[in-house]
Amino acid sequence: MGRAAPGPDEGAEGERPSISATALARMERNRRRALALRQARLAARPYPQAAAGAGPPQGRDTGGGFFLEEEEEEEEQRRAAERIVHPPAPVLQFDYLICGDCGKEFMDSYLMQHFDWATCDNCRDAEDKHKLITRTEAKEEYLLKDCDLDKREPVLRFIVKKNPHNPRWGDMKLYLKLQVIKRALEVWGNEESLQEAKEQRRDSREKMKQKRFDKKVKELRRAVRSSLWKKTASIHEHEYGPEENVDEETYKKTCTVCGHELTYEKM
């Protein structure tokens, strides 16, 4: 007799079909291969992907079947620029200055730079001809006013230096003496008028000085006279001489020191 087919309860309770060892080995190989591929991708790209919009570096199609990277393109441009031959620049004609003393040409100098005075450095005489004077000396010696130095065109140029006598004082303004003399002649017309004005001012100063001196002497004499009078009046005692009979009952005595007369009656 044949064996009867198992019922539903018997099928559920029976054992499930087992996986073969070959299938398990294949699954393990696939898992390891997937891990190896993942690690390879991470090793090739260790940093996170850049933000959107930052694509790979752009290249230039050379038309020869390959792209030229940016660095290679810059190097090629540099080499091309080195191969360019520029024509020589034309020779420039400079506007040379003519020294007013020696007549030679020069490019620049101390007096030209600071005072716009055409004299080269070789001819500069800082101790005599091209001497610098202070603003006070320019006003007193050449009778110039502030407007003559600061407002009259062209305005005189100057340099500023520390006061050598005391650094705490204000800075000095130094002018070129030649330019100050030229400005004084423009103001006064000629040298004779300047000398006359200087003599008049000198005489006026002498008169004012003498007047102040006389006033002080007068005040001193008055003070001395007043002190002597007070001293004499405070300590003088009359020394009368013999009395004289002026009238029947009137007599007088005279001080032998100051001449004071004392008149009195005697009964």
Curated annotation (Swiss-Prot):
Q: Which GO terms describe its molecular function?
A: damaged DNA binding; zinc ion binding
Task: Please give the InterPro entries that the UniProt record associates with this protein.
Answer: DNA-bd_dom_put_sf, XPA/RAD14, XPA_C, XPA_CS, XPA_sf, Znf_XPA_CS
Where it sits in the cell: the answer is: Nucleus
Q: What is its main location?
A: nucleus
unnamed zinc fingers: which residues? 99-123
Answer yes or no on keyword DNA damage.
yes
Q: Which domain of life is it from?
A: Eukaryota
Q: Where is this region: Disordered?
A: 1-21, 46-65
Any one GO CC term of the record: nucleotide-excision repair factor 1 complex
Q: Which UniProt keywords apply?
A: DNA damage, DNA repair, DNA-binding, Metal-binding, Nucleus, Zinc, Zinc-finger
Which residues are Zn(2+)-binding? Answer: 99, 102, 120, 123
Compositional bias annotation for Low complexity: 46-60
Q: By its UniProt entry, which Gene3D superfamilies does this protein fall under?
A: XPA C-terminal domain
A Gene Ontology annotation in the biological process aspect, one of them, is:
base-excision repair
- Positions of short motif Nuclear localization signal: 25-46
State the protein's purpose: Involved in DNA excision repair. Initiates repair by binding to damaged sites with various affinities, depending on the photoproduct and the transcriptional state of the region.
Q: Which family does it belong to?
A: Belongs to the XPA family.
Q: Under which name does UniProt file this protein?
A: DNA repair protein complementing XP-A cells homolog
Could you read off the lineage of the organism from its UniProt record?
A: Eukaryota, Metazoa, Chordata, Craniata, Vertebrata
Its gene is XPA
